[in-house]
Design a protein with these regions (language model features):
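Hydrophobic alpha-helical segments at protein termini of multi-pass membrane proteins
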Residues: 1-230
Length: 230
C-alpha cells in the first residue's frame, strides 16, 4: 500500500476533527474521549455491512439499479439509513452514561467524531483501492468527508436537544436520526441518479442542484454549531 494515497485519505477527516475541536475551544472535551468516539465510529463500517448484506440477500436492497426511482431507493436503503442508524447507535452507546456529556455542544462534538471515524475508514477504502486515487481523494475531500461532518453535526444537534430538553425528548430523538438520514439520502440520490442513463441537460441540472445542496448543508451545519456554542 502506497503511503501517499493513504495519507490523502486520512487528511480530510483529521482536518475536520481539528476544526470541530477548535470550534469547541472555550470548553473543550478531553482528547482521550474524542479519540475514543472517533475510534468507535470506525466500527460503524462493519455494523453498516451487517445491516446491508442480509437485506441484499433477501432482495430488499438492490445490487443494481437502472431507473431514477431505483437510484433514490438505493441511496436511502443501502447508504443513508444503515450508515446513519449505525452511527447513531454507536453514539448512544458512547454517551448514554458519559459524564463528559454535560453541554449542548458536546453532542455535536462527539457525533462529529463518530461520523468522521466512519468517514475516515470509508475514505481509505475508496482511495487506496482505486487506481485513479488522486482524483477520488480530491473529490471526496471536497464533498464526501465534509458531508459526513455535516450529518454528524445534524445528529449531535438534535441528540443534545433530546438530552437537555426532556419535555421534547421523543421528537428530538427521532430527528437525530431522521434529519441526517434525509440529508444523506438527498446527497447520495443526486449522485446515484447521475449514474443512470439520463439526458445531458438533466445531468447538468442535477450537478447544479448537488453543488447548491452541499453549500446549504455546510451552511446549516455552521449555524447549528453557533447555536449550541451560544
Amino acid at each position: 500500500m502506497s503511503f501517499l494515497p493513504l495519507l490523502s485519505a486520512f487528511i480530510p477527516a483529521i482536518v475536520l476533527l481539528g476544526y470541530i475541536y477548535w470550534r469547541d475551544r472555550k470548553s473543550p472535551e478531553p482528547l482521550k474521549q474524542l479519540l475514543k468516539a472517533t475510534a468507535l465510529g470506525v466500527l460503524a463500517i462493519p455494523l453498516t455491512l451487517a445491516i446491508v448484506y442480509p437485506l441484499q440477500w433477501i432482495g430488499v436492497i438492490l445490487e443494481e439499479y437502472t431507473t431514477i426511482f431505483g437510484a433514490i431507493y438505493d441511496a436511502f436503503m443501502s447508504a443513508a439509513i444503515p450508515e446513519e442508524l449505525s452511527k447513531l447507535l454507536l453514539l448512544w452507546l458512547f454517551l448514554r452514561k458519559n459524564p463528559y456529556f454535560d453541554e449542548r455542544m458536546d453532542g455535536i462534538v462527539y457525533a462529529v467524531c463518530v461520523s468522521l471515524g466512519f468517514a475516515g475508514l470509508e475514505n481509505i477504502l475508496y482511495v487506496v483501492l482505486n487506481e485513479d486515487w488522486a482524483s477520488i481523494a480530491i473529490s471526496r475531500a471536497i464533498f464526501a468527508v465534509p458531508g459526513h461532518f455535516c450529518y454528524g453535526v445534524m445528529m449531535g444537534y438534535f441528540y443534545s436537544l433530546a438530552k437537555f430538553e426532556p419535555l421534547h425528548r421523543t421528537r428530538y430523538s427521532a430527528l437525530a436520526l431522521l434529519v441526517p438520514v434525509v440529508a444523506h439520502g438527498i446527497y447520495d440520490s443526486l449522485l446515484f441518479i447521475m449514474q443512470v442513463y439520463i439526458p445531458t441537460w438533466l445531468e447538468s441540472i442535477l450537478l447544479l442542484c448537488f453543488l447548491v445542496f452541499c453549500f446549504y448543508l455546510w451552511k446549516w451545519a455552521s449555524k447549528s454549531i453557533k447555536r449550541h456554542i451560544g
